[in-house]
Design a protein with these regions (language model features):
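C-terminal motif of bacterial Sec signal peptides marking the signal peptidase cleavage site
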Residues: 15-18
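Bacterial signal peptide processing site
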Residues: 20-22
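A short beta-strand motif characteristic of beta-propeller blades
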Residues: 57-65, 103-109, 141-147, 179-186, ...
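Beta-strand-rich domains and repeat architectures in extracellular enzymes and scaffolds
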Residues: 57-94, 110-117
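Repeated scaffold domains used in trafficking and secretory/extracellular systems
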Residues: 68-77, 113-121, 148-157, 188-199, ...
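Residue position within the beta-strands of beta-propeller blades
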Residues: 84, 127, 161-163, 204-206, ...
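Structural motif
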Residues: 90-97, 132-134, 166-172, 210-221, ...
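Short loop/turn segments that connect beta-strands within beta-propeller blades
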Residues: 99-103, 137-141, 173-178, 223-227, ...
Length: 384
């Protein structure tokens, strides 16, 4: 009996030992790496150099960007007044005019004719002139040289973006003239060729500082209101003849030996496409509506829709380079012998800039809107 019990106990121990051996965890063998090592190639994208850029929105003293403004507006609107650059006397003279409470006055004059690019922020006017970027109070007064050496610039959210010879492409807080914060300094000097506003940011066309102003490597760069940069396009070739934008797209024209072609860049995903060749009118003017000075949103959106816009040119389209005809609120035609250069749309008005063939002066005309009708038209004239 005892022998049988011992034998049975021995069998049980052997069975338990076997089960333990089967359930013991086995060491995990590392799987061989089947993917070969990939060499990291430096890609020339804006994201690759983004590490060099501080976040503009995180800088102390920088307000959040509200809305991009047109780089060279015809008229700048303040809360109680509107401002514009008048060059009607001659190309050699230019002045800033202000209209407030129906009264017009000249608040700044430049004798060298270099006055350009008017912008408004926090009670101050900013403009470019020979020597740099100036600023002055909105009501007039002494103008101070604020950014020596600054040239073309863009202002959004209280931050001016420009190119300086020593700092390269940089951002400067408009509300603090003592603060200059370089945003990006590349080994090769870049210059701003053009800026256009889009929903949520500004598109900059940057180019290498080549002897030929129309040549060099071009970067189409989007600065969003959050302070983030994106490279939309990089290419080599001549500078586009005209650049303009609508809400979310950048349009530009490029002239080749085969004619002029229209291109589009989608600012949401960077998609790039050539939309085709523009037809050429018998008089040599590209039709329909050749944009030439940056803001042609009105042309692209309302071109040929006569009943909606109630604007006409000689060929029933609003065409730059042609005489401008407008359909008045009293159902009568009004012919303006104005060689049309630029158009700007605001919620209240349309502004037209052109050269009068009657006296050769460069004028700005305003047409106010009332609902779907044209209410009133007047010329923004400098003070006598």
């Amino acid at each position: 009996m005892k022998k049988t019990a011992r034998l049975l106990l021995l069998c049980i121990c052997l069975l338990l030992a076997g089960c333990t051996a089967q359930t013991a965890p086995q060491p995990i063998q590392p799987e061989p790496d089947t993917q070969p090592e990939q060499a990291v190639q430096p890609a020339r994208t804006w994201q690759d150099i983004q590490a060099q850029l501080p976040d503009v929105s995180a800088m102390s003293g920088f307000p959040a960007a509200e809305q991009a403004w047109h780089p060279e507006p015809i008229v700048v609107h303040g809360e109680e007044a509107e401002y514009w650059i008048d060059q009607s006397e001659s190309w050699e003279t230019a002045r800033i005019c202000m209209r407030k409470d129906g009264q017009t006055a000249s608040i700044y004059a430049a004798q060298d004719g270099s006055l350009s690019q008017l912008a408004l922020f926090d009670g101050m006017l900013y403009f470019a002139q020979i020597g740099g970027i100036y600023r002055m109070p909105m009501e007039g007064g002494a103008a101070e040289l604020w950014i020596p050496g600054g040239g073309r610039f863009a202002l959004t959210g209280g931050v001016i973006y420009t190119w300086l010879s020593e700092q390269g492409f940089c951002a400067i807080a408009a509300q603090d003239p003592e603060q200059a914060v370089p945003v990006w300094k590349q080994e090769q000097a870049l210059t701003i060729k053009q800026t256009v506003p889009v929903t949520g940011g500004i598109v900059f066309w940057l180019a290498e500082n080549e002897p030929d102003p129309d040549a060099g490597q071009l970067w189409v760069v989007l600065l969003r209101n959050s302070g983030q940069w994106e490279l939309l396009r990089e290419e080599t070739g001549p500078m586009p003849r005209s650049i303009f934008s609508d809400d979310t797209n950048v349009w530009f024209m490029r002239e080749t030996s085969e004619g002029q072609f229209l291109y589009q860049i989608d600012c949401k995903d960077g998609a790039y496409a050539c939309l085709g060749k523009l037809p050429e009118a018998p008089d040599g003017c590209y039709s329909p509506g050749t944009p030439v000075l940056g803001f042609q949103r009105l042309l692209m959106r309302y071109q040929g829709i006569e009943s909606t816009m109630e604007f006409y040119a000689l060929d029933d389209k609003l065409t730059l380079g042609e005489h401008l005809l407008s359909y008045g609120a009293d159902d009568s035609y009004a012919i303006y012998f104005l060689h049309l250069f630029e158009i700007q749309e605001t919620p209240q008005s349309f502004y037209f800039c052109g050269k009068s063939e009657e006296n050769g002066l460069y004028l700005v005309s305003e047409i106010r809107k009332s609902g779907d009708r044209l209410l009133r038209e007047e010329a923004l004239q400098p003070p006598v």
